[in-house]
Design a protein with these regions (language model features):
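Sec-dependent N-terminal signal peptides
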Residues: 4-13
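Structural signature of tandem-repeat unit edges
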Residues: 30-37, 62-75, 85-98, 108-121, ...
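A generic local structural motif
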Residues: 52-55, 302, 409-412
């Protein structure tokens, strides 16, 4: 039967145009031996554009425990060993110079692998979902680590990246739950989006001074990260870059940074210190405020539980205190005219907030999920309240509106707020507020404000 399969394989996969020829044999002990020269790329599903089809041993993949690639084979094809779920070891000769996309995807029992210094790149998704992989040796011949190369290698505890590597792709180590340490050399100039997303055991990381941008979501979900060093080579920090780094205690923004995108430090609930270095032309942390302020616009873009909003700030930016769940109270100075989208979203310990009479607009979801906020007073200066502003503020016991004209309400402003709580409004505006708030509160809840 095995000879018959081999004959079929030679008939289908002999590429005389390129002299490509691969021979394979699967022994009774589960050893797959591969010899020849150039291994083609494969696909789990037939690709009508390229003619690529599944590897000839794919139907036997669950029997494969060990792979021996003999010297002379120059490359490992795309998806060559995908879902070989019983594979525990592999021998790669130094004749191999390339490893194709998703070559070992889903090899969930593979524990260790040594990549020889003949290989120059680790391709996209090479070890994706290799859950048992605890050890991998990357040689100094490798210049790039592709996107998703080690995604969800949940047992991988440490990784040393050689100084030959210049780029780390998107999601390269995303979901490596056990990764506690990683060494990134100065040769690396780019680290892709979500490269370390969800590395919950990673406690510290130093970004080399060869990197100029911290990409979107790159350290998102690194909930064990206590310290991070941002070099003064960095000029921009992407959106949600440090989202949910919940035990990160301090952050220093070097004077080289000229761009910080929205929600960069959202849900960093453990932050107690935020400092912008002196001499930064774009941002400052004036008056030791423990916040990042965009200097020209006087917009506070990121704060922490110890932040004090200076009275020179005119707006609170998008997600400025998002997820700051240790914040219990905040005073907004009367210099502020707008509260941005999601500004205090998820501040689950916030019991009180004073909105000054200078504020004219409150952005979408500004106080969403402030689940212990007890009361709120909307001053007569406010003309618009965005979508879902008090959504899930189910601890509210009263709401007060001081304006004689109701502000413009977007959808779901008071969704999941107790409908029976009193809503106090100016006596001569009761009917107007009954109409404006009819979707949220019964008419009996709208009451005259007592002065």
């Amino acid at each position: 039967m095995r000879k018959y399969l081999l004959l079929i394989f030679f008939a289908l996969f002999s590429f005389s145009a390129t002299n490509a020829e691969i021979r394979w044999k699967l022994s009774d002990d589960g050893t797959l031996t591969i010899s020849g020269t150039d291994m083609p790329d494969y696909r789990i599903f037939y690709d009508t554009n390229t003619g690529q089809t599944i590897a000839p041993w794919y139907s036997e993949r669950e029997k494969i425990k060990k792979i021996v690639i003999e010297n002379g084979v120059t490359g490992i094809g795309q998806e060559a060993f995908t879902y070989c779920v019983s594979l525990t070891s592999i021998t790669i000769p130094n004749s191999v110079t390339s490893i194709g996309k998703f070559a070992f995807k889903g090899c969930s029992e593979l524990e260790s692998i040594t990549i020889l210094n003949s290989v120059t790149s680790i391709g996209e998704g090479t070890f994706y979902n290799c859950y048992a992989l605890t050890s991998v040796t990357i040689p100094n011949s490798v210049t790039s680590i592709g996107q998703e190369a080690f995604t969800h290698c949940e047992s991988l505890t440490s990784i040393t990246i050689p100084n030959s590597v210049t780029s780390i792709g998107d999601w390269a180590f995303g979901g490596c739950l056990s990764l506690t340490s990683v060494t990134i050399p100065n040769s690396v100039t780019s680290i892709g989006e979500s490269a370390f997303d969800g590395c919950k055991s990673l406690t510290s990381i130093t970004i080399p001074n060869s990197v100029t941008r911290i990409e979107d979501t790159v350290f998102s979900g690194c909930s064990g990260l206590t310290s991070i060093t941002i070099p003064n080579s960095v000029t921009s920090i992407g959106s949600i870059a440090f989202y949910d780094c919940s035990v990160l205690e301090s952050i220093t923004i070097p004077n080289s940074v000229t761009s910080i995108e929205r929600y960069a430090f959202s849900d960093c609930s453990g932050l107690t210190s935020i400092i912008v270095e002196e001499g930064n032309a774009k941002y400052d942390s004036r008056d030791n405020c423990n916040a990042i302020i965009e200097t020209k616009s006087n917009t506070l873009i990121a704060g922490c539980k110890n932040a004090v909003i200076p009275n020179t700030v005119t707006s609170i930016g998008h997600g400025a205190f998002d997820g700051c769940d240790s914040l219990t109270t905040i005073t907004i100075p009367n210099s502020v005219t707008s509260i941005g989208e999601g500004a205090f979203k998820g501040c689950e310990s916030l019991t009180s907030v004073t909105i000054p009479n200078s504020v004219t607009s409150i952005g979408d979801y500004a106080f969403y999920d402030c689940s212990v906020l007890e009361s709120i007073t909307i001053p007569n200066s406010v003309t618009s309240i965005g979508e879902g502003v008090f959504f899930n503020c189910y601890a509210l016991t009263s709401i007060t509106f001081e304006g004689s004209t109701p502000p413009r309400f977007e959808e779901d402003v008071f969704k999941d707020v107790n409908k029976s709580i009193p809503v106090y409004v100016p006596a001569n505006s009761i009917e107007a507020y009954k109409k404006a708030l009819g979707d949220y509160f019964p008419e009996t809840s709208i009451r005259a404000l007592q002065h």
